[in-house]
Amino acid sequence: MATKKNEQIKGRTDGLVAENRRSRREYSVEDTLEAGIMLVGSEVKSLREGRANIAESYASVEQGELWLINAEIQTYGGANRFNHEPRRKRKLLVSRRELSKLSQEVERAGRTIVPLKLYFNDKGRAKLLIGVATGRKAHDKREHEAKRDWARDKARIMKAG
């Protein structure tokens, strides 16, 4: 049943709803973690339609809880007056041990928690892949792009030759 519902998301079968492609360029991701999200019913239905944007969002630890801030899940058309607020703070569900590890990384090492992917797992539950990352400087971004381009050219040459 879950795979049938996942096929409704923009014709995708992997359950992916939204991806933060800019985060791989802007940040150097060291560690990833899967977190659950507390959603209301209209948000889940909107996600099943693929109407979400996590490009400008981030996660932060506040008062011993992990929150997703500035993520946009558009309103669901069939929910009329019982709809949700599109850019509200959403609580992320992680274990106590994972939360303490994340908060230590942010406080001590000055890292950032960035959302990478929003998707439905095999059981049909909405999950968010978050990464612990450090910001890249402009020269790091150029160097990363140059390495990627060289790898692409090298693969093209090896394939042709």
From Swiss-Prot:
Q: Where is this region: Disordered?
A: 1-23
Sorted UniProt keywords = Cytoplasm, RNA-binding
Record carries keyword RNA-binding: yes
Keyword NAD assigned: no
SUPFAM superfamilies the UniProt entry points to: Small protein B (SmpB)
Q: What is its main location?
A: cytoplasm
Kindly give the Pfam families that the UniProt entry links to this protein: SmpB
Gene Ontology molecular function: any one: RNA binding
Disulfide cross-links: none
Family annotation (InterPro entries):
SmpB, SsrA-bd_prot, SsrA-bd_prot_CS
Extract the CDD domains matched here.
SmpB
- Cellular component annotations (GO), alphabetically ordered: cytosol
Highest taxon listed in the record's lineage: Bacteria
Q: Which GO terms describe its biological process?
A: trans-translation
Compartments where located: Cytoplasm
What NCBIfam families is this protein classified in?
A: PRK05422.1, smpB
Q: What does this protein do?
A: Required for rescue of stalled ribosomes mediated by trans-translation. Binds to transfer-messenger RNA (tmRNA), required for stable association of tmRNA with ribosomes. tmRNA and SmpB together mimic tRNA shape, replacing the anticodon stem-loop with SmpB. tmRNA is encoded by the ssrA gene; the 2 termini fold to resemble tRNA(Ala) and it encodes a 'tag peptide', a short internal open reading frame. During trans-translation Ala-aminoacylated tmRNA acts like a tRNA, entering the A-site of stalled ribosomes, displacing the stalled mRNA.
Family the UniProt entry places it in: Belongs to the SmpB family.
* Record-given protein name: SsrA-binding protein
**Organism name:** Hyphomonas neptunium (strain ATCC 15444)
Recorded name of the encoding gene: smpB
